[in-house]
Amino acid sequence: MSMSQPSIDFSASSVDVARSLIGATLLVNGVGGRIVETEAYDHDDPASHSFSGPTRRNQVMFGPPCHAYIYRSYGIHWCLNFVCRPAGHGAGVLIRAIEPLVGLDIMRKRRGLSDERLLCSGPGRVCEALGITQEYSGMSIDTPPFQLTPPLDPVPVVTGPRIGISKAKDVPWRFGLAGSPFLSRPFRQPDIV
C-alpha cells in the first residue's frame, strides 16, 4: 500500500501527481473539500486530449505545470484537470471527486440537492459545486481563486481502470481514497498501491 506524498510535484508524471493529489484539500473561492478520486492522462495515452498534439482546445495541457485545464465533456459538464510535467509535454490529472467539507450550503445551492455524497462525486459535479467554468482554464492552481493543500498525513490509495473512456480503458490510472463514500463510482477489485 502506498501513501500520498507530503507535497505535490506537478513536474512529475501524471500518474505520480494523480496519486499524490488523493487526500489533498482543494478550495476554489473558499469552497471545496478533500480530493478523493483522480485520473491520470499523458500525451502518449490515446484517451488523453493531448494525444494528437496541441490544439486550440487543449493548448493549456501543453503549458507549464500547476495550471488548470478546463474542458466541457459531451458539451454539458465542465471538467477540471491539473496540468503536470514540463511545458510542452501535454499531461494532466482529472479531478473526479472530492469530499465536500467547506461551503456546503453554496455547493447545495449550485447543485440543487442536499445529499453530501452526491455534491462532488463526478468531474462535472465537482465543477458545478465549486463554480468552475471555462474562465478558470489556464489559471495557476497555486494562487487564488484556487487553494490546494497537500495532505498532512499519508492516506491509503486504491487504483483501477479509468471511467467513461473508449480508448486505453484497462490502464489502471484511476486513483481513489480507500473506503471513501464520496467516489464517483466504487472501485471494482481495486489494487491498493
From Swiss-Prot:
Q: Which domain of life is it from?
A: Bacteria
UniProt signal peptide: none
Q: What is its EC number?
A: 3.2.2.-
**Which Cys pairs does UniProt list as disulfide-bonded?**
none
* SUPFAM superfamilies, per database record: FMT C-terminal domain-like
- GO molecular function of the protein, one example? DNA binding
Q: Which GO terms describe its biological process?
A: base-excision repair
Q: Does the keyword Hydrolase apply?
A: yes
Q: Which CDD domains does its entry note? A: AAG (cd00540)
Q: What class of enzyme is it?
A: hydrolase
InterPro entries in the cross-refs: Formyl_transferase-like_C_sf, MPG, MPG_sf
Q: Which UniProt keywords apply?
A: DNA damage, DNA repair, Hydrolase
Q: Which HAMAP family match?
A: 3MGH
Return the similarity comment.
Belongs to the DNA glycosylase MPG family.
Identify this protein by name: Putative 3-methyladenine DNA glycosylase
The organism of origin for this protein: Nitrosospira multiformis (strain ATCC 25196 / NCIMB 11849 / C 71)
